Amino acid sequence: MLKIPLQLSSQDGIWPARFARRLHHHHQLAYHHHKQEQQQQQQQQQQQQAKQKQKQNGVQQGRSPTFMPVMLLLLMATLLTRPLSAFSNRLSDTKLHEIYLDDKEIKLSWMVDWYKQEVLFHLQNAFNEQHRWFYLGFSKRGGLADADICFFENQNGFFNAVTDTYTSPDGQWVRRDYQQDCEVFKMDEFTLAFRRKFDTCDPLDLRLHEGTMYVVWARGETELALEDHQFALPNVTAPHEAGVKMLQLLRADKILIPETELDHMEITLQEAPIPSQETTYWCHVQRLEGNLRRRHHIVQFEPLIRTPGIVHHMEVFHCEAGEHEEIPLYNGDCEQLPPRAKICSKVMVLWAMGAGTFTYPPEAGLPIGGPGFNPYVRLEVHFNNPEKQSGLVDNSGFRIKMSKTLRQYDAAVMELGLEYTDKMAIPPGQTAFPLSGYCVADCTRAALPATGIIIFGSQLHTHLRGVRVLTRHFRGEQELREVNRDDYYSNHFQEMRTLHYKPRVLPGDALVTTCYYNTKDDKTAALGGFSISDEMCVNYIHYYPATKLEVCKSSVSEETLENYFIYMKRTEHQHGVHLNGARSSNYRSIEWTQPRIDQLYTMYMQEPLSMQCNRSDGTRFEGRSSWEGVAATPVQIRIPIHRKLCPNYNPLWLKPLEKGDCDLLGECIY
């Protein structure tokens, strides 16, 4: 039997094997189920027509028809309409993603066809007896202005009307799209099933992407004039009749754990009193229970959030000390952490608001236990308590699954982005001001193995002002595919995302993480720091094989910043700036005119850096005599044109780059 590789590897990264090949076993499985159950004649005819079309396409493109993805439609119908064996369920579970739109009844399922560049949607319980219509669509940030919506209509018990529409810029009107792209293949009182291309090449449709997408939905009993070119958008306010959900639509297949025997462990706070202040970092140093004399691999971790809305993010740090060395137990504010416990700084697992369970790929796991392993860890939880509530107690933490069967690679976590420092500032009144953190070529050259590392997971992180985050990958003067990008990032939805494309980072490569911030409501500059009112810019990447490099981050160099404040005081006559004063006070005293904002941006983009090329204990790698004054990686400023592959592409479809709607790089995000 021909063996089909699960992955294709290159110097740039790892792609999942060709979509059609990956589905080969699913296609066979669905075929045999259909044969065994002797489906109705109509379904057999549809299947035969699909196979004939598949064969024609395969001959035209030089591919075996067996591997073409047309059977994905039949597979999805099989998964959602009848029970399968346990084996087939395990196979199909990786393809099918699900979410409840109203948290109890209306279930949205979808499958991503990467080969055909389309998504198949399935809705359950969208209608009930009294509903006349249901809509599902996408908007940029959850609002109803300029939304892309498919309307489904029940006409006197006949569920056969669907209309592709878009909303007006004020969100008050619905207009019929001249190009209809909501392709329905099943619609009745229980089920809606339709598909959409990633990019319909329709300027009135939103392009489906791998970042955060906002799904808008509603249903109602009133009759709509869908045959009209324009009608008023129904005003639905009941929570079980309308809503918005954030999700990653174009996501990688789910990962199944191949090991059948797993050990479990919980690392949680123990009755931690939440202080009645806005920001607290709470630390709990504890000794791990269980038999860790034998080496294990962590294969999955699940957040246990006991105080939703207050717990902002959490991390577990391992204490890198001798096997028998005692670390003082502690349960209190991290600012009073015992000095000896500060050795607990190697990141193991982490979570931020909006994230769920994270599963490692079958080839890698996070090492824990074994000879020489110190059993102490530090759980750090960020409490965000803006209302300053008192009397709250928290027991949040993680549930961890481990396997005694070791996998091929040890995995690890690395921090990319900006240092947590007030050397970086964001002027007030900005729509999307960018700050970039660099992992420079000298650092990866000093720290990574010759064959490089494979990044399989990524979690982007900012505080309240972040609106877009991306990490770019450079090899010399060539820019490779981005590691991760979220143009519609929300700090309320900070998923740890398994990457569909897994980049390989080689020694000498550079990674540039850029965060964009909205400070329209701020009166003074926002600064980098730990408080929720400060800002961060981080990409936590999960990768293998593990290295000693844990932090690859930057900030503007001390000398550059000192010269900047001298210039502000002596040339720009900003008399609130004091040359020996606190950086935060200096930034906040500046009157931010547009030329001064441009000067700050230019300084951050072009001037030398202070680099953190650090091991987990804080020591620097020896790749340079000094990591102060390092040249920033040159970043090409470019305006992405997403629809350049459309056959009838018209540049006029792009929105004008009007001031206030776009960032400094000329990219419109709102």
Curated annotation (Swiss-Prot):
TM segment ranges: 65-81
Localization: Membrane
Pfam families with a match to the protein in the record: Cu2_monoox_C, Cu2_monooxygen, DOMON
Tissue: Present in head and in neurons innervating the oviduct (at protein level).
Sites carrying sugar chains: 235, 614
Lineage per the UniProt record: Eukaryota, Metazoa, Ecdysozoa, Arthropoda, Hexapoda
Top EC class of this enzyme: oxidoreductase
Cofactor note: Binds 2 copper ions per subunit.
Region (Disordered): 26-63
Binding positions for Cu(2+) B per the UniProt entry: 461, 463, 536
Membrane topology, from the record: Single-pass membrane protein
Induction info: Slightly down-regulated in adults fed a high calorie diet.
Residues forming coiled coils: none
Gene that encodes it: Tbh
Function: Catalyzes the hydroxylation of tyramine into octopamine, a neurotransmitter involved in ovulation and locomotion. Functions in an amine-mediated Bacc-dependent signaling pathway that negatively regulates acute ethanol sensitivity. Involved in facilitation of nociceptive escape behavior in response to potentially damaging stimuli, such as high temperatures.
GO CC entries: extracellular space; secretory granule membrane
Top-level taxonomic group: Eukaryota
Any GO BP: inter-male aggressive behavior
Listed GO MF terms: copper ion binding; dopamine beta-monooxygenase activity; oxidoreductase activity, acting on paired donors, with incorporation or reduction of molecular oxygen, reduced ascorbate as one donor, and incorporation of one atom of oxygen
Annotated EC: 1.14.17.-
Subunit field text: Is most likely a monomer under physiological conditions, although under conditions of high pH and low ionic strength the dimeric form predominates. Both forms are equally active.
Regions of compositional bias (Low complexity) in chain numbering: 38-61
The protein, known as: Tyramine beta-hydroxylase
Compositionally biased region (Basic residues): 26-35
